[in-house]
Amino acid sequence: MVHLTGEEKAAVTALWGKVNVDEVGGEALGRLLVVYPWTQRFFESFGDLSSPDAVMNNPKVKAHGKKVLGAFSDGLAHLDNLKGTFAQLSELHCDKLHVDPENFRLLGNVLVCVLAHHFGKEFTPQVQAAYQKVVAGVANALAHKYH
């Protein structure tokens, strides 16, 4: 559960309505793989990840980034029940994929950076603070199965 004020929730919802999930999802996942290259081990089937350009232009990275942000969108619609919303994804990433849960926090922080880049002055410190709460809540929910 993420505790947002009414103002924070409105800010998150308003900005998210302007997000191009295809573009932002691919950029966020791509940046995660470039900035934290050890995360690439979970995506060996994606083909060429040999350079930043290869990662950022990889169609499988872009497609999976879109899928990731689709799940994030679901979370935004269920902020009062993030653990329930992400229960199956938590189980998948824990039991089958063996993803280090720290990676969820890293991806959340990268997403915040990408949103700041895309929205500039509109991504005020107050909006960032609200999004930091949301990505922390989502990361916690995704890591729930690990506890």
UniProtKB/Swiss-Prot annotation:
Modified residues (Phosphoserine): 45
Single GO BP term: hydrogen peroxide catabolic process
Chain positions with S-nitrosocysteine modification: 94
UniProt-listed CDD domains: Hb-beta-like
Phosphothreonine modification, residue list: 13
The Globin domain, residue ranges: 3-147
One GO MF term attached to the UniProt entry: heme binding
Keywords: Acetylation, Heme, Iron, Metal-binding, Oxygen transport, Phosphoprotein, S-nitrosylation, Transport
Residue list for modification N6-acetyllysine: 60, 83, 145
Leader peptide range in chain numbering: none
Reported function: Involved in oxygen transport from the lung to the various peripheral tissues.
Subunit comment: Heterotetramer of two alpha chains and two beta chains.
Protein name from the UniProt record: Hemoglobin subunit beta
Natural source organism: Pithecia pithecia
Taxon lineage: Eukaryota, Metazoa, Chordata, Craniata, Vertebrata
